[in-house]
């Protein structure tokens, strides 16, 4: 029997895939069953679902179970401090959208599918405690009955997220080398309630961004007409979560920097005090496995900052790539090693691109030269679709292009865009004959 620790979206999807390969699965989760109405916290966490995640859900045969919970976002709606707005489309094809989805609803839907499959045994309120690698067993605490149960690691797959206890256990036993790099910024979740009759108070087909240089606010739509907003801010310094330490400074800060958003936040002060500052950082580990006994997968192996909307998508892609290794019926240790060797260069690439995207979201999106390069990028894709696809589009809308390839081609394309826009202020200034020569010389067909 395969043991999976962590029944969030990644662990649930992995269990479904492996069950369909004929394996029996024991799925352990610290939290209560998400199908229980009491299990949902008062906070609403939104995730971005893009092409890679959708492809994985379709491979697993569960996309139709998730689709009703999805809200499409066609692009970014930039909110300037003077209350002006500007829409920046993500792509130029009807299918090039990103979906906002409630983490709780997504997890609930996946658990409902898993619960119906014979051979998947769900154990909620069961927390991983420790591993004994000499006896190839793990100790898991049954929180309802306050007792320890021992389960075999034959193998144990850890999908227990960025704070993975299994990763720390493997690291403590020097079976892997793991690190956590903390970003100087943190985040705080806030809310924008629905308007009268449940109407959306802002456009519901966009990701709303208030870029302000060293900090920003974003908001994603919810199915009930509300928005989940997230404030990203340095943890310490003159403008920071540390400095926003009383009702007056909080209100003044939001009213000054995000006036149109502040007017839509009647519960700002209560939420600001009640909600903790969240951790932002990058997790790295090498290797991801210990022999044939245990393997990390998803955020447990490679958590990233959330600024490319790829955390969950990357984890879901992990699941189908590991499933492809399992399909070969290799011994577990060999399957783990092959999966890690092929996957890690791609997860390293998206982790780096996610960090770069933070700078883009909070600073560059409001910059005229950046906006020109974005417009040119889409125009070059229209003219030369076999060779030029914007990096953002490669990551978000092309699951067939590995992250590493997107990163490498993206670097070349960035040089081309910089070269072509030097001295230009509009698309009419661009020499497209020269653009074609550069693209043909520097980019192979995709």
Predicted features along the sequence, with ranges:
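Hydrophobic "anchor" residues on beta-strands that sit immediately upstream
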Residues: 2, 25, 121, 150, ...
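Glycine-rich FAD cofactor-binding loop and adjacent beta-loop-alpha segment at the N-terminus
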Residues: 2-3, 7-75, 79, 94, ...
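Conserved mid-domain beta->alpha element of the FAD-binding
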Residues: 7-20, 190, 276-366, 402
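N-terminal Rossmann-like dinucleotide/flavin-binding domain of flavoprotein oxidoreductases
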Residues: 55-59, 106-121
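Acidic/histidine metal-binding catalytic segments
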Residues: 68-72, 121, 256-273, 331-338, ...
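Helix-loop-beta segment of a Rossmann-like dinucleotide-binding subdomain
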Residues: 84-101, 232-236
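Conserved FAD-binding catalytic core of PHBH/FMO-like flavoproteins
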Residues: 112, 117, 126-130, 135-290
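C-terminal helical "tail/cap" subdomain of flavin- and related membrane-associated enzymes
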Residues: 324-446
């Amino acid at each position: 029997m395969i043991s999976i620790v962590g029944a969030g979206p990644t662990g649930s999807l992995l269990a479904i895939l492996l069950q369909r390969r004929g394996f029996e699965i024991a799925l352990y989760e610290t939290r209560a069953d998400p199908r229980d109405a009491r299990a949902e916290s008062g906070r609403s966490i939104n995730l971005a679902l893009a092409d890679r995640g959708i492809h994985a859900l379709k491979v697993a045969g569960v996309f139709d179970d998730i689709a009703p919970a999805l809200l499409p976002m066609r692009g970014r709606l930039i909110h300037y401090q003077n209350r002006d707005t500007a829409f920046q489309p993500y792509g130029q094809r009807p299918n090039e959208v990103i979906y906002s989805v409630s983490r709780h609803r997504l997890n609930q839907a996946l658990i409902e599918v898993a619960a119906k499959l014979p051979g998947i045994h769900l154990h909620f309120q069961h927390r991983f405690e420790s591993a004994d690698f000499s006896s190839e067993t793990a100790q898991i605490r049954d929180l309802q009955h306050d007792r320890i149960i021992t389960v075999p690691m034959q193998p144990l797959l850890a999908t227990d997220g960025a704070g993975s206890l299994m990763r720390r256990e493997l690291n403590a036993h020097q079976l892997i080398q793991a690190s956590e790099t903390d970003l100087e910024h943190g985040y705080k979740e806030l809310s924008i309630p629905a308007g009268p009759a449940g109407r959306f108070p802002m456009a519901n087909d966009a990701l709303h961004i208030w870029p302000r240089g060293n900090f920003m606010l974003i908001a994603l739509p919810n199915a009930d007409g509300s928005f989940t907003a997230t404030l990203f801010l340095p943890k310490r310094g003159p403008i920071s979560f540390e400095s926003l330490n009383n009702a007056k400074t909080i209100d003044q800060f939001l009213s000054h920097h995000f006036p149109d958003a502040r007017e839509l936040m009647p519960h700002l002060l209560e939420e600001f005090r009640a909600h903790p500052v969240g951790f932002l950082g990058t997790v790295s580990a090498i290797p991801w496995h210990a022999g044939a006994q245990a393997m990390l997968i998803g955020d447990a192996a490679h958590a990233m900052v959330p600024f490319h909307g790829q955390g969950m998508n990357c984890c879901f892609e992990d699941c189908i790539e590991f499933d492809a290794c399992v399909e070969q019926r290799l011994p577990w240790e060999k399957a783990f090693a092959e999966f890690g060797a092929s996957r890690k260069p791609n997860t390293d690439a998206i982790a780096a691109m996610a960090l770069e995207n933070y700078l883009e979201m909070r600073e560059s999106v409001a910059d005229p030269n950046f906006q020109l390069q974005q417009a040119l990028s889409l125009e070059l894709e229209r003219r030369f679709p076999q060779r030029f696809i914007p990096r953002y589009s490669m990551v978000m809308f092309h699951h067939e292009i590995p992250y590493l390839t997107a990163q490498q081609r993206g670097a070349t394309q960035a040089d081309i865009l910089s070269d072509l826009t030097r001295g230009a202020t509009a698309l009419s200034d661009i020499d497209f004959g020269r653009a074609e020569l550069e693209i043909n010389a520097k980019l192979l067909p995709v």
